[in-house]
UniProtKB/Swiss-Prot annotation:
MF (Gene Ontology): fibroblast growth factor receptor binding; growth factor activity; type 1 fibroblast growth factor receptor binding; type 2 fibroblast growth factor receptor binding
UniProt cross-references to SMART domains, sorted A to Z: FGF (SM00442)
Membership in a protein family: Belongs to the heparin-binding growth factors family.
Role according to the record: Plays an important role in the regulation of cell proliferation, cell differentiation and cell migration. Required for normal ossification and bone development. Stimulates hepatic and intestinal proliferation.
Domain of life: Eukaryota
Gene3D superfamilies: 2.80.10.50
Any Gene Ontology biological process: chondrocyte differentiation
PROSITE patterns: HBGF_FGF
Signal peptide boundaries: 1-27
Gene that this sequence comes from: Fgf18
Protein known as: Fibroblast growth factor 18
Alphabetized PANTHER family for the sequence: FIBROBLAST GROWTH FACTOR
Length: 207
C-alpha cells in the first residue's frame, strides 16, 4: 500500500524548493548586474560631469614616458618633457578615457591595424581607451573599439601593435606620474568637520 507523505516531509520539500528558487534568482541578479556594469563601462556617458587631469604615463618597459609627437607616438620622454604631458579626460561612468598631448593637442589613438597614431580629432572611438588598474598597481589601457588590444611599447620606446599585446605583458603596464614640479600643485580633497548647531536661546523679557 502507498502511504501519503507526512506533513513534515511536505514542509521539508517546500523549504528545499524555496531555497533553490532563491539561489537561482540571486545568480541571475549577479549576472545581470555584471552585464549592466560592463555595458555602462563601454557606453558613452553624456550626463556625468567629465574630469580632465594632467599627468604623465611612465612605461614599465622603456623606463620613459609616453609622448604624443603629433601623429607619431613613442615612450621615450624624460620626466617633465613637454611632449610627455598628457591631458586625460574621463569619458564615461566606467573607466573610459581620451588622452591628448598638451603640447601638440593631438589625441592618442589606435587604428584598425592596431597601430598607435596621433590624431587632431579625438571624437572617434579609436581614440577611446578603457583604463584598467592591475593587481601590481600598474595601469593598462585597452582600446574601447578593438577589445583585447592594448597600448604597449618595446624597451626602446617603440609602439607595439595591438594584436601583439596582452594584459599580463610588462609592455602594456604604465604608472601615472605628475609632471616635474606639478605634484605640489595637485591639492588633495579637504574634509570639513560639521558641528551641530547650538540651539539659540531667546532672551526673556520681564513681563
Amino acid at each position: 500500500m502507498y502511504s501519503a507523505p507526512s506533513a513534515c516531509t511536505c514542509l521539508c520539500l517546500h523549504f528545499l524548493l524555496l531555497c533553490f528558487q532563491v539561489q537561482v534568482l540571486a545568480a541571475e541578479e549577479n549576472v545581470d548586474f555584471r552585464i549592466h556594469v560592463e555595458n555602462q563601462t563601454r557606453a558613452r556617458d553624456d550626463v556625468s560631469r567629465k574630469q580632465l587631469r594632467l599627468y604623465q604615463l611612465y612605461s614599465r618597459t622603456s623606463g620613459k614616458h609616453i609622448q604624443v609627437l603629433g601623429r607619431r607616438i613613442s615612450a621615450r620622454g624624460e620626466d617633465g618633457d613637454k611632449y610627455a604631458q598628457l591631458l586625460v579626460e574621463t569619458d564615461t561612468f566606467g573607466s573610459q578615457v581620451r588622452i591628448k598631448g598638451k603640447e601638440t593637442e593631438f589625441y592618442l589613438c589606435m587604428n584598425r591595424k592596431g597601430k598607435l597614431v596621433g590624431k587632431p580629432d579625438g571624437t572617434s572611438k579609436e581614440c577611446v581607451f578603457i583604463e584598467k588598474v592591475l593587481e601590481n598597481n600598474y595601469t593598462a589601457l585597452m582600446s574601447a573599439k578593438y577589445s583585447g588590444w592594448y597600448v604597449g611599447f618595446t624597451k626602446k620606446g617603440r609602439p607595439r601593435k595591438g594584436p601583439k599585446t596582452r594584459e599580463n605583458q610588462q609592455d602594456v603596464h604604465f604608472m601615472k606620474r605628475y609632471p616635474k614640479g606639478q605634484a605640489e600643485l595637485q591639492k588633495p580633497f579637504k574634509y570639513t568637520t560639521v558641528t551641530k548647531r547650538s540651539r539659540r536661546i531667546r532672551p526673556t523679557h520681564p513681563g
